[in-house]
Swiss-Prot record:
Protein name as it appears in the record: T-cell surface glycoprotein CD3 zeta chain
Name of the gene encoding the protein in the UniProt record: CD247
Keyword Transcription among record annotations: no
Post-translational modification: Phosphorylated on Tyr residues after T-cell receptor triggering by LCK in association with CD4/CD8.
Matching InterPro entries: CD3_zeta/IgE_Fc_rcpt_gamma, Phos_immunorcpt_sig_ITAM, T-cell_CD3_zeta
Taxonomic lineage from the root: Eukaryota, Metazoa, Chordata, Craniata, Vertebrata
Locations listed in the record: Cell membrane
Topological domain spans for side Extracellular: 22-30
Membrane topology term: Single-pass type I membrane protein
UniProtKB keywords: Adaptive immunity, Cell membrane, Disulfide bond, Immunity, Membrane, Phosphoprotein, Receptor, Repeat, Signal, Transmembrane, Transmembrane helix
Domain ITAM: 61-89, 100-128, 133-161
PROSITE patterns assigned to the protein according to its UniProt record, in alphabetical order: ITAM_1
Organism per entry: Ovis aries
Pfam families from the UniProt entry: ITAM (PF02189), TCR_zetazeta (PF11628)
Length: 166
């Protein structure tokens, strides 16, 4: 059905060609030059308007002075600072609501500094587990990688059933 429709459309296109761009004169070089000129003039005008708007904003800024528009009067607080200065008094933490920070024990600190002398001993040699330390499974330990002993025992107790053929 699809092939017959495709063949019919192909035969009709060969007998009655769709009007080409040449019949309308759209490939005439004079028309292309005219359209290029219009596009160039449009680009120059848009660029001039953009530059005028960009550099003339300083003259438009004093249009909303104090007292003219009540919407903008609410925003004028009379000070030049845009942001408040945090932590003017030393020792106060803004994350704790401005309350003074209490001195923490070194054991209560979340992040401890790295001590290279102690770390060098721990990571100088990484040992391998001996055979008696490894847990021996039923021969397919690769399936159970990363499971705890309790979870591994649960999986060992389950019997795998073969999937039915499709």
């Amino acid at each position: 059905m699809k092939w017959t429709a495709l063949v019919i459309v192909a035969v009709l296109q060969t007998q009655f060609p769709v009007t080409a761009a040449q019949s309308f004169g759209l490939l005439d070089p004079k028309l292309c030059y005219l359209l290029d000129g219009i596009l160039f003039i449009y680009g120059v005008i848009v660029t001039a308007l953009f530059l005028r708007a960009k550099f003339s904003r300083s003259a438009d800024a004093p249009a909303y002075q104090h007292g003219q528009n009540p919407v903008y009067n609410e925003l004028n607080v009379g000070r030049r600072e845009e942001y408040a200065v945090l932590d003017r008094r030393g020792g106060f933490d803004p994350e704790m609501g401005g309350k003074p920070q209490r001195k923490k024990n070194p054991h209560e600190v979340v992040y401890n500094e790295l001590r290279k002398d102690k770390m060098a001993e721990a990571y100088s040699e990484i040992g391998m587990k001996s055979d008696n330390q490894r847990r021996r499974g039923k021969g397919h330990d690769g399936v159970y990688q990363g499971l705890s002993t309790a979870t591994k025992d649960t999986y060992d107790a389950l019997h795998m059933q073969a999937l039915p053929p499709r």
